[in-house]
């Protein structure tokens, strides 16, 4: 029987540097001899990518936004994530359900209970094995976004939205029993990478 793979997620508010480290982590795991699938949310499937376009560009009701996030996630879990894990692959995902707790539950003030109900429906038996939460103060995140591409609908939100989102992420980390590791990504890139390298190697050794 093929051993189950491991499921890694990367989280953080927009501008925290999360996506910068995703490709590096995928390559680091491959360099350790692992078969790795890189994916993202919303997205990861043809249906999910179409929903991503809507979610990042079109104004919509909070409830619609939340349900579309989980619709994309449902397709993603069933068609991509679960099959890859069953094949023994390691999956590295740029955002997962912690993002819904943070952005919709916290930023949009939907609350955790409704997000939890959808989580229980869509993937009751799947949780990441390890989540790295890239964390920066709001002013650092804003400065990074200002230097990037044209901003999407979420990235254009007001400061209060991002403060609530960041606070919700921290609450998730506190209640995660160590699954979520917070990375201070306001530090120099090489310092962050050194910490990640150590923690990735630790995770791989534990899985051996």
From Swiss-Prot:
Xref: Pfam families: Thymidylate_kin (PF02223)
Binding site for ATP: 12-19
Superkingdom of origin: Bacteria
Keywords: ATP-binding, Kinase, Nucleotide biosynthesis, Nucleotide-binding, Transferase
GO function term, MF aspect, one: dTMP kinase activity
GO biological process, one term: dTTP biosynthetic process
EC primary class: transferase
InterPro entries (UniProt xref): P-loop_NTPase, Thymidylate_kin-like_dom, Thymidylate_kinase
Listed Gene3D superfamilies: P-loop containing nucleotide triphosphate hydrolases
Record-listed E.C. numbers: 2.7.4.9
Family of this protein: Belongs to the thymidylate kinase family.
Function: Phosphorylation of dTMP to form dTDP in both de novo and salvage pathways of dTTP synthesis.
Annotated protein name in UniProt: Thymidylate kinase
């Amino acid at each position: 029987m093929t051993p189950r793979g491991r499921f890694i997620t990367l989280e953080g508010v927009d501008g925290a540097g999360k996506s910068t480290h995703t490709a590096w982590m995928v390559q680091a795991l491959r360099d350790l001899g692992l078969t790795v699938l890189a994916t993202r949310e919303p997205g990861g499937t043809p249906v999910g990518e179409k929903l991503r376009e809507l979610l990042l560009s079109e104004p919509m009701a909070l409830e619609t936004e939340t349900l579309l996030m989980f619709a994309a996630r449902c397709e993603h879990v069933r068609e991509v994530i679960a099959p890859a894990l069953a094949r023994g692959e390691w999956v590295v995902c740029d955002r997962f359900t912690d993002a819904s707790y943070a952005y919709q539950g916290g930023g949009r003030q939907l609350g955790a209970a409704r997000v939890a109900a959808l989580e229980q429906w869509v993937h009751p038996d799947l949780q990441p094995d390890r989540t790295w939460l890239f964390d920066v103060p709001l002013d650092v995140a804003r400065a990074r976004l200002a230097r990037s591409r044209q901003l999407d609908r979420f990235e254009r939100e007001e400061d209060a939205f991002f403060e609530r989102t960041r606070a919700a992420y921290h609450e998730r980390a506190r209640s995660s029993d160590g699954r979520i590791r917070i990375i201070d990504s306001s530090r120099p890139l090489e310092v962050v990478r050194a910490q990640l390298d150590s923690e990735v190697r630790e995770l791989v050794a534990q899985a051996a």
